[in-house]
């Protein structure tokens, strides 16, 4: 449920619900406005389109990876001119210190040359004290199988290695190159009926650690597939634990996942088509999942990436609202907090014609930082990545 804070809308459940986390007069929109006013642009001036950032924060620096292009606003896996780039931001001063493209179509590396195609949906992991590992998909829809690659970034020299390495997908049938065909085959063997596509397999909600293991939510956006995976110790193979795509009548994508206080897994899934509202599914073991269903604390979601994090001892659920500001898509984003994953309060409400979409949140030394896609002119508003302090 969402508690009746100022700017919060509905109450579900009984009067015996836990004590409120926020003051009765808390203004979620005012809090969101204050955050947005202090954001800084991390995108280079020549960039026309930028989207889907992820980041890690190490030794006072935010390392932000993003897909970008210098041709037009927006993004598409069918645009071979989309590349992936890294921005380094000092979190104390919010100053952008470095920007570097690390993979693009037909780029020549020491051990391989990338084929023609978009470099898409980058993800970043701190592998050890000296190394960041960055993953991305190389895609050319309807022409070849997409492949997920990775390369390492040395924190001491602040430089990328000049080699690419293939990531792998472990399924019930064995270990394969990380390509959509194997992800689909594993789901199909368990009754998944949507057709296979040759692109769209991404590391989506990443990376989350529980009981000494590292997990990630896998996604095939055009294929409507979702699964929980565990990452091996070498950080090069993703083992599918369980798929959560039911009911088959809904096309569900781009999930975010976390574990509740009793150990139950819970995922929130984006919905394409239908009423476009988010659905939720749970699992006791990460392998067998309940049929997705709507929950009352998300009454009017829109088709966009959700977030589901644990920060400062609370759960944080971020979701795109279907309400539009002056007709702008993805112009309202809610960020709710909870102690138990059931009783929710609205802490931030971001309303802007610049859009507020695909945010990423990271806790570092007692503060929470965010990166988010915004724009001014293109209808998609996928033009730049903003960075700043949430609280």
Segment roles from a protein language model:
Residues 117-119:
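Elongated alpha-helical scaffolds
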Residues 1-4:
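Positively charged n-region of N-terminal signal peptides that target proteins for export
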Residues 21-48, 56-115, 125-254, 258-304, ...:
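Beta-rich carbohydrate-recognition and catalytic domains
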Residues 6-16:
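Bacterial N-terminal signal peptides
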Residues 341, 364-367:
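Hydrophobic alpha-helical segments
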Residues 357-358:
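Active-site pocket scaffolds in enzymes
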